[in-house]
Amino acid sequence: MSQAVQTNGTQPLSKTWELSLYELQRTPQEAITDGLEIVVSPRSLHSELMCPICLDMLKNTMTTKECLHRFCADCIITALRSGNKECPTCRKKLVSKRSLRPDPNFDALISKIYPSRDEYEAHQERVLARINKHNNQQALSHSIEEGLKIQAMNRLQRGKKQQIENGSGAEDNGDSSHCSNASTHSNQEAGPSNKRTKTSDDSGLELDNNNAAVAIDPVMDGASEIELVFRPHPTLMEKDDSAQTRYIKTSGNATVDHLSKYLAVRLALEELRSKGESNQMNLDTASEKQYTIYIATASGQFTVSICQ
C-alpha cells in the first residue's frame, strides 16, 4: 500500500506502509444486518470509559493528538500544568494544551450509555462518602494502636538506656574509688575476709577489705519500679488530715526503713505547709520520726514489717 504526496518541489514524496503478519492475515468483521441486538453490561465498558488519572468516568473528554488517549479535560490540563509535558499513559511528549482536542462524540456515547449521569455521580459520591467514613474510623483506631505500641517501645528503650548509663556511671565511680583507696591504704595488708562495708553514698558500690570496688548491677539489684499503697491503721491512727491513703512509686531497692523515713518527711512537710511554717528544725525533728509499717495478712490482722 503506497501513497504519493505532491509537495512544492519538483519531485513527489512517496510513503509506503508495510503491513504486519497480523494485518495481512486478519479478516474484516462482518456487519450485523439482521437486526440482532447484543446486550452488554455498562460495567464491562467501565475500563473503556474511565479516565486514567482520576479513575472515574470521563467528563468533558479531551483526546491527545499524538497517541489518541482520552482524559478528562480538568485532569489532563492540571497534569500538563503541574507535571511533565507528556502523556500520563504512554509518556509521549505533549507540548501544551494545543496537543489536545475535545472529543464530543465520545461524550455523546457516554451520555447514550448512561442517560442519567447526574444520578450515577450522586450514587458514586454516596459510596465514596461511606467508604471514607469507614476507612477514617479504621485509620484512627489503627493510628491509636500504633501510637500505643511506639510509646511502649520508647519507654522500654529509655529504661534500658538509663540502666546502661547507671551501670557505666557505677563502673566509673568504682574505678575512681579503687584508685583513691589504693593510694590511701597502700600500707595495709589485704586479709582474707568475706565482710563487705557499704559506702555512705547511694552510688551503689560495695567495698571489701581488699579495697576493691564492686559495682552493683542495677538490673540484678531489683531496680524495677513498684507501686505501694499506704493506708492508715484502722485502730492506731487518729481520724485527722494526715490519715489519708498514700500512693508511692519507688524502685525495688527501697527498704522498709527508707519508706518509713520518707513517710515521716512527707507528712511533716504537709503539716508545715498546712500551718504555713517553714522551720528547718521542725523538719529535722520530723525526719527523725519513724512510722511503723504493717502488712495486712488477713481480714483484721496485721503483721509488723521489720526495717532492713
UniProtKB/Swiss-Prot annotation:
<dbReference type="GO" id="GO:0000278">
    <property type="term" value="P:mitotic cell cycle"/>
</dbReference>
<feature type="region of interest" description="Interaction with HIP2">
    <location>
        <begin position="2"/>
        <end position="179"/>
    </location>
</feature>
<dbReference type="GO" id="GO:0006325">
    <property type="term" value="P:chromatin organization"/>
</dbReference>
<keyword id="KW-0007">Acetylation</keyword>
<dbReference type="InterPro" id="IPR032443">
    <property type="entry name" value="RAWUL"/>
</dbReference>
<keyword id="KW-0832">Ubl conjugation</keyword>
<keyword id="KW-0597">Phosphoprotein</keyword>
<dbReference type="GO" id="GO:0000122">
    <property type="term" value="P:negative regulation of transcription by RNA polymerase II"/>
</dbReference>
<dbReference type="InterPro" id="IPR013083">
    <property type="entry name" value="Znf_RING/FYVE/PHD"/>
</dbReference>
<feature type="cross-link" description="Glycyl lysine isopeptide (Lys-Gly) (interchain with G-Cter in SUMO2)">
    <location>
        <position position="249"/>
    </location>
</feature>
<dbReference type="GO" id="GO:0021510">
    <property type="term" value="P:spinal cord development"/>
</dbReference>
<keyword id="KW-0862">Zinc</keyword>
<keyword id="KW-0678">Repressor</keyword>
<dbReference type="GO" id="GO:0007281">
    <property type="term" value="P:germ cell development"/>
</dbReference>
<keyword id="KW-0963">Cytoplasm</keyword>
<dbReference type="GO" id="GO:0001702">
    <property type="term" value="P:gastrulation with mouth forming second"/>
</dbReference>
<dbReference type="GO" id="GO:0071339">
    <property type="term" value="C:MLL1 complex"/>
</dbReference>
<keyword id="KW-0479">Metal-binding</keyword>
<dbReference type="InterPro" id="IPR043540">
    <property type="entry name" value="RING1/RING2"/>
</dbReference>
<dbReference type="GO" id="GO:0071535">
    <property type="term" value="F:RING-like zinc finger domain binding"/>
</dbReference>
<keyword id="KW-0805">Transcription regulation</keyword>
<keyword id="KW-0863">Zinc-finger</keyword>
<dbReference type="GO" id="GO:0008270">
    <property type="term" value="F:zinc ion binding"/>
</dbReference>
<dbReference type="GO" id="GO:0001739">
    <property type="term" value="C:sex chromatin"/>
</dbReference>
<dbReference type="GO" id="GO:0032526">
    <property type="term" value="P:response to retinoic acid"/>
</dbReference>
<feature type="zinc finger region" description="RING-type">
    <location>
        <begin position="51"/>
        <end position="91"/>
    </location>
</feature>
<feature type="modified residue" description="Phosphoserine">
    <location>
        <position position="168"/>
    </location>
</feature>
<comment type="function">
    <text>E3 ubiquitin-protein ligase that mediates monoubiquitination of 'Lys-119' of histone H2A (H2AK119Ub), thereby playing a central role in histone code and gene regulation. H2AK119Ub gives a specific tag for epigenetic transcriptional repression and participates in X chromosome inactivation of female mammals. May be involved in the initiation of both imprinted and random X inactivation.</text>
</comment>
<keyword id="KW-0808">Transferase</keyword>
<keyword id="KW-0158">Chromosome</keyword>
<dbReference type="InterPro" id="IPR017907">
    <property type="entry name" value="Znf_RING_CS"/>
</dbReference>
<dbReference type="GO" id="GO:0061630">
    <property type="term" value="F:ubiquitin protein ligase activity"/>
</dbReference>
<dbReference type="GO" id="GO:0005737">
    <property type="term" value="C:cytoplasm"/>
</dbReference>
<dbReference type="GO" id="GO:0031519">
    <property type="term" value="C:PcG protein complex"/>
</dbReference>
<dbReference type="GO" id="GO:0003682">
    <property type="term" value="F:chromatin binding"/>
</dbReference>
<dbReference type="GO" id="GO:0009948">
    <property type="term" value="P:anterior/posterior axis specification"/>
</dbReference>
<protein>
    <recommendedName>
        <fullName>E3 ubiquitin-protein ligase RING2</fullName>
        <ecNumber>2.3.2.27</ecNumber>
    </recommendedName>
</protein>
<dbReference type="GO" id="GO:0016567">
    <property type="term" value="P:protein ubiquitination"/>
</dbReference>
<dbReference type="GO" id="GO:0016604">
    <property type="term" value="C:nuclear body"/>
</dbReference>
<dbReference type="GO" id="GO:0005634">
    <property type="term" value="C:nucleus"/>
</dbReference>
<keyword id="KW-0833">Ubl conjugation pathway</keyword>
<comment type="pathway">
    <text>Protein modification; protein ubiquitination.</text>
</comment>
